Amino acid sequence: MRKTLVYWMVLLLAVYFPSAHAYIGLCCAKCGGNMPMNIPGGGIPETKEFRFKLSPMYMSMDGLADGADTISANSLLGMPVMMGQPTGKFMAVPTSMDMKMLNFTAGYSFSDDLFGGVMLMYKSNSMDMKFSPMMQTTTGQTDFTMESSGVADTMLMGKYRLFSDDPLVPTREASLMFGLSLPTGSIDEQNSNHPLAMRQGERLPYGMQLGSGTYDPTVGLLYQGSKSPYWWGANAMYTARLYNNDRDYRLGDEFRLDLYGMFQFRYNMLVEAQLNGSYWGKIHGEMDEAKTGASGHVTKNDPTSPYTTPLWDPNNYGGRKLLATLGFQWQPAPFNIIDFNIGVPVYQHLNGPQLKEKYQVMLTWYVEIPTRASIRYVKQKAGESSLGF
């Protein structure tokens, strides 16, 4: 699938469309004309207008990796302790994970240079776990599924235009992105699906929680250029984790770099290709219940005993990843855009063992609503002329 996606990315960007014309883009001309919907992009939207985005997203993870090397689940399963010594084996290991998200973003352009918005998120996690032979005998099951779902963290965001070569129809512009993630997602989710009743009151591991538990600032720099029918851009974003949450840990800092190119081959359609690079650090600290042994240890309430699964080790989080993404945008009606994109990893180096990403898919419905103060506001539809048309 990875090779096929890269092939089509190259083919669609290289192919010649003889019917291409000079377009101003599917979005408003002031914001740059075209911009990606799955990442922050473009400039500042038309002044005094609202923007809304509804984006369901699905990500699939499958198989384990340590660094760049694939490892099998069976190689990690076994007796965690033998003759009083830890073996490095685990009672259960993850084999796959499905993550579903629904994002709703609302924003408003306050001036020619300033845009503000808020993004609300709902998340559903499902992770398949395989048991060791000992646990299979104890539970009578070969595996089980950990689940969590609910409201995730909320993002407040803003963009300030630093530079533009034209105030109305820019072909080059740069913007400053700034944001603050609010800890509205739960960090108290429990392992209620575990087949052993004594484990059902334990907390879920870090990656199955719904939020970070901290207020996390984000800052970024966005650049976009265009020469119709082509658009391109680069976005660099950094998210800092500055302190431990109420459960005595904090997620690792994150850095993201996105490069994108777009080709508008019709007045209401375009194709896009992206390279999405990301780095995220290890978890700092340790969950309070893991420190006391109440959750995540082979011997309950004994924090000196080994972890039940590699998911409880804070060092098994973080890494580097590069995705190749191919997308399509369609404008079915004025002020509306439908965006579909699919991304697959072309490189992953993980602080493992941890699950590898297989692919992700996102569908976005984007709507622009001019207010009465916008230059694009239309008071009423034009009637028929005296000639009847």
Outline where the language-model segments fall.
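Surface-exposed strand-loop-strand hairpins of Gram-negative outer-membrane beta-barrel proteins
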Residues: 25-28, 60-99
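Residues on the lipid-exposed face of transmembrane beta-strands in outer-membrane beta-barrel proteins
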Residues: 41-43, 54-56, 104-108, 118, ...
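Outer-membrane pore/translocation modules
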Residues: 121-245, 316, 370
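Extracellular loop and loop/strand-boundary signature of outer-membrane beta-barrel proteins
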Residues: 39-40, 88-92, 139-146, 204-209, ...
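Residue-level detector of the transmembrane beta-barrel scaffold of outer-membrane proteins
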Residues: 51-53, 115-117, 157, 173-177, ...
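Residues that define the transmembrane beta-barrel architecture of outer-membrane proteins
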Residues: 48, 98-102, 148-156, 172, ...
